[in-house]
């Protein structure tokens, strides 16, 4: 089985880093599986600064150090994709209603990733690129790879 590589939408990253309920547990399960090498996770370089701004409530100095600490931990197993001028121009020329979605789709296609994980039900369909939430991603892995990710109760 080849390791799957997926791009995470910002909402999934916020669910995990911000422990946003009720979505945190599914995002946490995704991060744990990635941390032990089950699949590769990707985010864009632009998402890094977006996350600092959002999670520090607009850049509040007292919150920034903790946000940076969480992002450094995430970077232990999360790949970051650069955003090129060509990517930015493609996003600017896109007719998608959400520019971030257009950029993420462009990056996922450029990197030849296997899927995009998002909670955005309005994320447009992309030919040849599954777009799903965390729960559907694990169901997809069960169907396509025969792998079941369940938490062990100790």
Give a label for each model feature.
Residues 1, 5, 110-154:
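Acidic, PIN/NYN-like endoribonuclease modules and their adjacent C-terminal/linker elements
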Residues 1-43, 59-63, 140-154:
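Short, well-structured N-terminal submotif of metal-dependent ribonuclease cores
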Residues 12, 47, 87, 104, ...:
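Alpha-helix capping/helix-boundary segments
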Residues 28-31, 46-93:
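Active-site-proximal, substrate-binding regions of enzyme catalytic domains
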Residues 37-41, 76, 112-114:
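Short active-site oxyanion
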Residues 43-47, 100:
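Short, conserved alpha-helical segments within structured domains
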Residues 78-121, 148-149:
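Active-site neighborhoods of divalent-metal-dependent phosphate/nucleic-acid chemistry enzymes
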């Amino acid at each position: 089985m080849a390791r799957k590589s997926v791009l995470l939408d910002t909402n999934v990253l916020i669910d995990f880093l911000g422990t946003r309920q009720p979505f945190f547990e599914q995002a946490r399960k995704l991060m744990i599986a990635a941390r032990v090498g089950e699949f590769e996770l990707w985010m864009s370089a632009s998402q890094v600064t977006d996350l600092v701004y959002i999670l520090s409530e607009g850049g509040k100095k007292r919150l920034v150090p903790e946000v940076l600490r969480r992002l450094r931990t995430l970077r232990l197993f999360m790949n970051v994709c650069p955003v090129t001028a060509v990517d930015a121009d493609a996003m600017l020329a896109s007719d998608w209603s959400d520019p971030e979605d257009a950029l993420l789709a462009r990056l996922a296609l450029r990197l030849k990733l296997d899927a995009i994980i998002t909670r955005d039900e309005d994320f447009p369909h992309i030919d040849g690129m599954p777009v799903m939430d965390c729960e559907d991603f694990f169901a997809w892995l069960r169907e396509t790879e025969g792998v079941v990710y369940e938490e062990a109760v100790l």
